[in-house]
């Protein structure tokens, strides 16, 4: 019994000591510890304005659709839901929801193939919003090359990949390149043919010739035609050409040309004949001058002595010397009186002026022949009388 009492007392004492210690520990609450916090690092998140966010959302929608298609989601109803997103965060949430629901029914095999990318987390935060690092998971394929899921660093790389992806032109015929908010470039294939840019028109060589109006051009052609026509007609004088070149209107050129041609044609068709003067030239013999050629000097007395010896000698001397021309004898007054009665002197002068030169010569020859015959006949009669 004594042992039991001692154990009991020890247990009670231990309990008192433990309880007091516990109560003492619980009563003394520890004070608040002050810890110096380090300054927060500046956020690497891109801060965009409202307009920039709208442009980024507009560019990311076709990229999101293309990625869903690559997963095998081709329903237009589901793809059209992408267009209803009003913010980049809403677009990201919608894509993740569609992806998770689709992957539950269509799990992706983990076996790697040539066409299967190394990473299957195609819709990480940095892909759509550009909030992550430049080189995140899925940026490069297993060969270390960039792919269209995560963009290309340069536009040239994106264009090369797009040309290679076109492959069969019967399906995809064109592509477009766009730059995401993350600064990387993406291509989107299209079945419509791209419009070929129009080539800039080549500049034609400038015409160095002096510019002229239509009236000046017509005047120039009219002058050239007029000069050519004058040359064709045989007119080569520079005087006429200069006159045409000085003309200031087409009408003036035509008028000058017609006047010159008319004057030139008049000279050829109606050549001027030499004027015939009524005055009698020297050594010219008229018909009446030979009426008394056998009578010597042509007086009345010489006419009466026509059958005398002196008259015969004079006639024979004249016949023996035919080369010497005799002076014309004066006309008989009686014959002049008779002719004055018939023809007036003015009329006689007009007839002489109108008579051509060839006709005069014929008349002179006939009168000479008649005079010689009359002289021979007179000589013959005088010889008979003597006998």
From Swiss-Prot:
This is Peptostreptococcal albumin-binding protein. A motif (LPXTG sorting signal) lies at residues 355-359. Residues 213-265 are annotated as: GA module. The modification Pentaglycyl murein peptidoglycan amidated alanine is found at residue 358. Pfam families: DUF5633, GA-like, Gram_pos_anchor. The lineage of its organism: Bacteria, Bacillati, Bacillota, Tissierellia, Tissierellales. Residues 1-26 form the signal peptide. It comes from Finegoldia magna (Peptostreptococcus magnus). PROSITE patterns: GRAM_POS_ANCHORING (PS50847). Residues 298-360 have a biased composition (Basic and acidic residues). It is found in: Secreted, Cell wall. The keyword Nucleus does not apply.
């Amino acid at each position: 019994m004594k042992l039991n009492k001692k154990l009991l007392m020890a247990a009670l004492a231990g309990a008192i000591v433990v309880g007091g210690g516990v109560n003492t520990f619980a009563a003394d609450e520890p004070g608040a510890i002050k810890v110096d916090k380090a300054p927060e690092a500046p956020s690497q998140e891109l801060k965009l304005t409202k307009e920039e966010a709208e442009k980024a959302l507009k560019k990311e929608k076709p990229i999101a659709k293309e990625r869903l298609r690559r997963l095998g989601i081709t329903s237009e109803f589901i793809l059209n839901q992408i267009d209803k997103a009003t913010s980049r965060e809403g677009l990201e949430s919608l894509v993740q929801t569609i992806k998770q629901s689709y992957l539950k029914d269509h799990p992706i095999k983990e076996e790697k193939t040539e066409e299967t990318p190394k990473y299957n987390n195609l819709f990480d935060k940095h892909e759509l919003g550009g909030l992550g690092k430049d080189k995140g998971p899925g940026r490069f394929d297993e060969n270390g090359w960039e792919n269209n899921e995560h963009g290309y660093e340069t536009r040239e790389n994106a264009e090369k990949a797009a040309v290679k992806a076109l492959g069969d032109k019967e399906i995809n015929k064109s592509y477009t390149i766009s730059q995401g908010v993350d600064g990387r470039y993406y291509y989107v294939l299209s079945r419509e043919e791209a419009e070929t840019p129009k080539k800039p028109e080549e500049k034609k060589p400038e015409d160095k010739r002096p510019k002229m109006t239509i009236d000046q051009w017509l005047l120039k052609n009219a002058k050239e035609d007029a000069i050519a026509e004058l040359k064709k007609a045989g007119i080569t004088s520079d005087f006429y050409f200069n006159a045409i070149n000085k003309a200031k209107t087409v009408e003036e050129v035509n008028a000058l040309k017609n006047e010159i041609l008319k004057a030139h044609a008049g000279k050829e068709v109606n050549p001027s004949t030499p004027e015939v003067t009524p005055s009698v030239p020297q050594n010219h013999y008229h018909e009446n001058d030979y009426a008394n050629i056998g009578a010597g000097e042509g007086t009345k007395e010489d006419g009466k002595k026509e059958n005398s010896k002196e008259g015969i000698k004079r006639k024979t001397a004249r016949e023996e010397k035919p080369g010497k021309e005799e002076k014309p004898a004066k006309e008989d007054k009686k014959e002049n009186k008779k002719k004055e009665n018939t023809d007036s002197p003015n009329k006689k002068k007009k007839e002489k002026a109108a008579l051509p030169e060839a006709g005069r010569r014929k008349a002179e020859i006939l009168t000479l022949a008649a005079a010689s015959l009359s002289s021979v006949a007179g000589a013959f009669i005088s010889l008979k009388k003597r006998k």
